[in-house]
Amino acid sequence: MKVVVVGDGAVGKTCMIICYTKDEFPETYTPTVFDAHKGNMDYNGKEVSLHVWDTAGQEDLARLRPLAYPNANCFLVCFSLVDRESLKSAYTNWRNELITLGPGNCPKILVGLKSDLREEFMKDENKRAQCVTREEGMKAKEDYTF
């Protein structure tokens, strides 16, 4: 099964993928150009092999991203829970890109990342306004049709 992960740069896509496929937590941030990882999951009692394609969120690499889209079985559209703009971008930028360039009837799942940083951000008055609230996340789940 081919899973393609998209979203703005630095929202946590690569970290999520490495945690899932290698059971490791990367301590440093390295922007991704393009990478592919393998993992397995149990689905209805059957082991399924996942091929997870990690794409660059940076605009200057936008021409490379669509190379990962053909034959995708699923897209994970990622945003950071500590960056409200990345949630808006999930709908305005990533939704439009997948509608235009992605396979038509492919499921798209909205994924909030960096939940481990929310508590720290909520304590800081300057950073608090950047956080996506639970209510906003639930509303996005209902409103953001892909």
Language-model features: where?
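Ras-like small GTPase catalytic G-domain
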Residues: M1-V6, A10, C15-D23, E27, ...
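ATP-binding glycine-rich phosphate-binding loop
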Residues: V33
